[in-house]
């Protein structure tokens, strides 16, 4: 699993160009992925939500727009990323480690994490901590990269390992940060492996929905 100090430093170095780079590398699909998540959350009509590993606040902003009556708190252990989230209009930000969230049990209707769990040092510990702060009847939603199981698998792996690091390096000046990405996606539990992990960490009725041919997957677990 990733080294926390490396991950924090890597994201601090690319914070200034993170949003633009994501849009380019995904050909804009990241905007749609977050729209799917925020639309699902809107249907639950939450009043208090925690967006873990919020980074520059892309998902938090989408949720603020779709759920104007909800208090959205964006947390991340990289202060440099959250500085950009605040500048972009995220109302509430908090520097916090997902492995030790500074909230009482049952504090939130929904906890969300987009493209963040994969970078955490201990997936089960992070999931247990997120589950802890969700109210009974609440929900955890996770959006993260995955490997397609169809004909896209081979070309996608080629893109991850051969094209993306060079393109991202040109955009950010930090190719090494994105060389780590492909390996982290391949090592990340996906599909039924992830839903099994969610249920072992105190969540019920875990499910997953592949998006864009399985390039990313949306997971849900209920408390």
Show which residues each predicted segment covers.
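Core SAM-dependent methyltransferase catalytic element
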Residues: 204-223
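A short acidic, Gly/Pro-enriched loop at the edge of an enzyme's catalytic core
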Residues: 99-110
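C-terminal alpha-helical "lid/dimerization" subdomain adjacent to the S-adenosyl-L-methionine
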Residues: 143, 147-197, 207
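A short SAM/SAH-binding and catalytic strip from SAM-dependent methyltransferases
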Residues: 109-123
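Class I SAM-dependent methyltransferase SAM/SAH-binding core
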Residues: 48-100
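N-terminal, positively charged/glycine-rich alpha-helical extensions of SAM-dependent methyltransferases
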Residues: 1-19
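Conserved alpha-helix/loop element of class I SAM-dependent methyltransferases that forms part
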Residues: 27-46
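A short glycine-rich, Lys/Arg-flanked "PGG" loop and its adjoining helix->strand segment in the class I
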Residues: 124-139
């Amino acid at each position: 699993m990733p080294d926390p100090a490396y991950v924090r430093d890597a994201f601090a170095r690319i914070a200034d160009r993170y949003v633009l780079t994501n849009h380019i590398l995904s050909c804009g699909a990241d905007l749609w992925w977050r729209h799917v998540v925020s639309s699902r959350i809107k249907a639950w009509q939450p009043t208090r939500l925690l967006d873990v590993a919020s980074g520059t606040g892309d998902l938090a902003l989408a949720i603020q727009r779709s759920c104007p009556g909800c208090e959205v708190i964006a947390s991340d252990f990289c202060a440099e990323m959250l500085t950009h989230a605040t500048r972009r209009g995220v109302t509430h930000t908090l520097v916090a480690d997902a492995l030790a969230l500074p909230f009482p049990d049952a504090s939130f209707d929904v906890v969300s994490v987009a493209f963040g769990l994969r970078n955490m040092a201990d997936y089960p510990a992070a999931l247990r901590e997120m589950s802890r702060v969700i109210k009974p009847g609440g929900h955890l939603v996770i959006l993260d990269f995955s490997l397609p199981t169809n004909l896209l698998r081979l070309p996608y792996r080629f893109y991850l390992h051969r094209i993306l690091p060079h393109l991202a390096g040109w955009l950010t000046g930090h190719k090494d940060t994105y060389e780590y990405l492909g390996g982290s996606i391949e090592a990340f539990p996906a599909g039924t492996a992830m839903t099994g992990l969610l249920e072992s960490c105190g969540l019920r009725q875990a499910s997953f929905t592949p998006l864009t041919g399985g390039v990313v997957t949306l997971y849900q677990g209920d408390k």
